[in-house]
Curated annotation (Swiss-Prot):
The gene is DPP1. Residues 43-65, 114-172, 215-222 are cytoplasmic. The phosphatase sequence motif I (including Arg-125) and II (including His-169) are part of the cytoplasmic loop 2 and phosphatase sequence motif III (including His-223) is part of the cytoplasmic loop 3. Optimum pH is 6.0-8.5. Optimum pH for geranylgeranyl-P-P phosphatase reaction is 5.0-5.5. It comes from Saccharomyces cerevisiae (strain ATCC 204508 / S288c). Catalyzes the dephosphorylation of diacylglycerol diphosphate (DGPP) to phosphatidate (PA) and the subsequent dephosphorylation of PA to diacylglycerol (DAG). Together with LPP1, regulates intracellular DGPP and PA levels, which are phospholipid molecules believed to play a signaling role in stress response. Can also use lysophosphatidic acid (LPA) and phosphatidylglycerophosphate as substrates. Substrate preference is DGPP > LPA > PA. Activity is independent of a divalent cation ion and insensitive to inhibition by N-ethylmaleimide. One of its GO terms (cellular component) is membrane raft. Present with 3038 molecules/cell in log phase SD medium. Residues 216-227 are annotated as: Phosphatase sequence motif III. This is Diacylglycerol pyrophosphate phosphatase 1. One of its GO terms (molecular function) is phosphatidate phosphatase activity. Its EC number is 3.6.1.75, 3.1.3.106, 3.1.3.4. Inhibited by sodium fluoride (NaF) and pyrophosphate. Strongly inhibited by manganese ion and, to a lower extent, by magnesium and calcium ions. Also inhibited by Cu(2+) ion. In an indirect manner, it is also inhibited by the zinc ion which is able to form a complex with DGPP and prevent the enzyme from removing the phosphate from the substrate. Not inhibited by N-ethylmaleimide. Keywords: Hydrolase, Membrane, Phosphoprotein, Transmembrane, Transmembrane helix, Vacuole. One of its GO terms (biological process) is phospholipid metabolic process.
Amino acid sequence: MNRVSFIKTPFNIGAKWRLEDVFLLIIMILLNYPVYYQQPFERQFYINDLTISHPYATTERVNNNMLFVYSFVVPSLTILIIGSILADRRHLIFILYTSLLGLSLAWFSTSFFTNFIKNWIGRLRPDFLDRCQPVEGLPLDTLFTAKDVCTTKNHERLLDGFRTTPSGHSSESFAGLGYLYFWLCGQLLTESPLMPLWRKMVAFLPLLGAALIALSRTQDYRHHFVDVILGSMLGYIMAHFFYRRIFPPIDDPLPFKPLMDDSDVTLEEAVTHQRIPDEELHPLSDEGM
């Protein structure tokens, strides 16, 4: 058995088209929903804890549907449009396929791990007491559990109050828009010293959008700042991991070309990242001095 492919033949078409990654993606998608709705760990709390005493916002600045559009649909459409414009026809289908595969893996894997972690941590949201509606007359500075003191009839909303760390909006926005940032850097050759600065600024826009989405969760009192920071870090790391699984580093001589791309596509004009030879930097030799 081959150590690389785990099959009897050393090479197969599935390696180039990353069929095993497609299978992993399907598993992540199927597991996401049940993982999120698992029973979270219910931590004890004080009814006079000011950090969980904020009002419950009935209207969110970025709800779940908007999050999916901003962090997954928009990056997907951007990749399809820009990729169709810039990519050479010899590898157009492959570059679009692998680019979208990497984005999907980054987004759904981040969502899976975020939901799994937040259910195990069970930290309370900033608006938890408004969700709980505790009975009146309870003593201060005393630990309580939700089942003992909460009077709300909305059990699903109450359980969601235990899912704050890390922030899913933050992790998923940085997973999708962070991946788009890396992808734009590679496709626009932003790390080449010959390219204008505006390319880097355009590539940076998705990160700005992700940051605004993440910060909106503190404005809605859905998350603490540490939840947003941890979620953003998780999403960014996952975006980088899955981007590098598909593409070379953004400072590679051919950063736009997928790693498994066997086409002969190269840059029309050579863009090198090599150091200038010392003799060009110091043309005067010892003999001429």
